[in-house]
Regions:
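Membrane-interface extramembranous regions
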Residues: 2-142
Length: 142
């Protein structure tokens, strides 16, 4: 007797596997909690992040602006629905972390200063790649 697949046609292979779901949430929680903590530190101008921004040549008000966007991005990644807003959050965080890598490199910082933003980029890409179907844009938009 033939079997009938009950998966959504756009879901892709093994989209609902438990391991994939756990990996998605591990990456997403890492990114969201890191962004939330860094956002609070930026808004409150707390060390070491505030001193680091000044060292990289950014003005003090930039920390407040960046912190607000980090907090909003973390909330959006954790909230259900709104896949288009999530795509913007992912894009903003990629810009933030890749800018951190370039800023450290341009200031002549040690290679170890690049590790944190690069780990965040890897977790962010993992979160984006592993996100479940309800958190993705419909194929008609992409």
């Amino acid at each position: 007797m033939p079997t009938v697949a009950l998966e959504h046609p756009e879901a892709g292979p093994r989209s609902a596997s438990p391991a994939r779901g756990r990996a998605y949430w591990a990456c997403t929680l890492f990114v969201a909690l890191t962004a939330l903590g860094a956002g609070v530190m930026d808004i409150l101008h707390l060390q070491p992040l505030f001193g680091l921004l000044l060292h990289l040549g950014y003005p003090p008000y930039f920390a407040t602006l960046l912190g607000g966007w980090k907090i909003l991005g973390a909330i959006v990644l954790l909230a259900p629905r709104y896949p288009l807003v999530k795509e913007w959050a992912y894009a903003g965080m990629i810009i933030d972390y890749s800018s951190a890598v370039v800023s450290h490199w341009a200031c002549g910082d040690a290679a170890t200063a690049l590790v944190g933003p690069m780990v965040s980029i890897a977790a962010l890409v993992g979160s984006w790649y592993l996100r479940p179907q309800p958190r993705r844009l419909p194929r008609s938009i992409v």
